[in-house]
Amino acid sequence: AGKTTFFDLISGFQDSDDGKVILNNKNITKSQSYTIARLGMVRTFQLTKVFDRMTVLENMMFSASKVDNDSFIKSLVKPPSQKNKEIDIKEKSFEIMKNLNIGHMANSYARELSGGQKKLLELGRSIINDPEILLLDEPLAGVNPKLAEEILEIILNLSKNGISILMVEHNIEAVMKISERVIVFAEVKVIADDI
């Protein structure tokens, strides 16, 4: 229907053939995804993208480092001058993991997580840099009903804390439960708006 493509276009993961993407009065149409993330719009993916050979904590800290334009090596091994920044990132990572109920898995490798726990990790990685806009691509796909309820509660809390959320989701009941506005896509067209 074009929902994920829409997210790809507005988050810089795919170039558009036509039209413009405006974020805070700035044309970001041809911007790279990392530039858009620095401007405050981040996303999750339908298929989780975590670093399986890193711990849950390392995944979180790496995500915080990348937005600061650190190189890959610097984001893994910080020089002594950045020790305080690293401590702050670590504390924030633990706080987020605790709030997402994955704090007890901080030292586990991401590959050891269940699919639902990987969804939580990806959500945590997406919010560690305090985004203004969060794009969630099927956050409930493949998770059990109990975890789906937990994720919905987390999404509601993020929204209450001032994060604007755009969500692609097939679970209509869940969408209606937490959304202020619903837009329905079919065959790359909007077929309903503000239902």
Residue spans for each PLM region:
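Conserved catalytic motifs of ABC-family nucleotide-binding domains
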Residues: 130
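Catalytic Walker B motif of ABC-type/P-loop ATPase nucleotide-binding domains
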Residues: 134-138
